[in-house]
A protein has these predicted regions:
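Short, charged beta-turn/beta-strand-edge "cap" motif at the junction between a beta-strand
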Residues: 75-78, 120-125, 299
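Ferredoxin-reductase
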Residues: 2-9, 14-114, 173-175
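Iron-sulfur (Fe-S) cluster-binding segments and ferredoxin-like electron-carrier domains
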Residues: 242-243, 248, 256, 271-300
């Protein structure tokens, strides 16, 4: 879940299992006490999007692509932010934040040296370990939805030289200056990934693709037999992308989507992030498409 959305209460049945091998991670001790982490680096990704690198704690960070942290802007509040990084030992970890409210505004304004609070990681992940090496992987991102997918893309791209399955990345954004991680696309392609980008609108003279991200999917050339798709973006986009992937031959069970609501506790206790039978901080954010499709008909709040 890329940036905050909004509210919702109660338990989720065991049948709501995480997709493609993902499993919830519950922090062992003091889950509601944030650790202080210093901002080491800040980069402006787009006019309203900032990536922050946070110093690692003793022993480094542990997480899986698709999970999220609860970040605290001290004196302002706390918000759920996806981890937009590839797991590694002892490195700073990056979070990509869109400026949409008081807490995210404070986080986006953070400069190197600022202390922020970190809780987690929480939630389900993209289940990369469960994807067969020979299967094609299709990643579809809309706008800031590429942030929760970036770690998965980086991991899959790094494995491309030795992985028989191919990697396809389709990215959509509203405007050219809102394309996330544009400076990394060539590196992913150099490792063997097929990367395509489209924008909804562009100024005169723009020589890139203009149109909906769904228009890219039939052109990618992936083998739907056994393929896995990872999808994150606005909910209306995910509805149409999921439908088109199924029409192109992907099995619905092999499509994973990342859903967001107003996550507050991160541990499935407060009920603010309830969506149907799911508590998205615990049973999500990554869920299987068949589970998500009925829930995606509910409007964003």
């Amino acid at each position: 879940m890329p940036s905050p959305a909004d509210p919702h209460t109660a338990g989720a049945p065991a049948a709501c299992a995480p997709p493609v091998g993902a499993a919830p991670f519950v922090p062992a001790a003091a889950p509601f006490v944030p650790a202080a982490a210093r901002v080491l680096e800040r980069r402006q990704e787009a006019p309203d999007v900032v990536t922050l690198w946070l110093e690692p704690p003793a022993g480094g960070w542990t997480w899986r692509p698709g999970q999220f942290h609860m970040l605290t802007a001290f004196g302002v509040g706390e918000v759920a932010i996806s981890i937009s990084d590839l797991p590694g030992d002892g490195r700073a970890i990056r979070h990509t934040v869109r400026d949409v409210g008081a807490v995210t505004h404070a986080l986006c304004a953070s400069r190197p040296g600022t202390l922020v609070g970190v809780r987690g990681p929480y939630g389900t992940d993209w289940g990369l370990d469960a994807i067969p090496p020979a299967a094609d992987v299709v990643v579809v991102a809309g706008g800031i939805g590429l942030a929760p997918l970036r770690g998965a893309v980086a991991a899959l791209a790094a494995a491309q030289p030795s992985r028989p399955g191919r990697l396809f990345v389709a990215i959509g954004a509203r405007l050219p200056d809102q394309v996330a991680f544009a400076d990394e696309h060539d590196a992913w392609a150099a490792l063997g990934a097929t990367v395509r980008v489209t924008v909804d609108a562009a100024p005169a003279g723009y020589d890139g693709r203009v149109g909906l991200v769904t228009a890219l999917l039939p052109e990618l050339g992936f083998d739907p037999a056994g393929a896995t798709a990872l999808v994150c973006g606005p909910e209306v986009m995910m509805r149409f992308v999921g439908r088109q992937l199924v029409e192109l031959g992907l099995h619905p069970d092999r499509i994973a989507v990342s859903l967001e609501r107003n996550m507050q506790c991160g541990a499935g206790l407060c009920g603010h992030c309830q969506l149907g039978p799911l508590l998205l901080c615990r049973d999500g954010p990554v869920v299987a498409y068949p589970t998500a499709i009925a829930l995606l008909r509910e409007p964003e709040r």
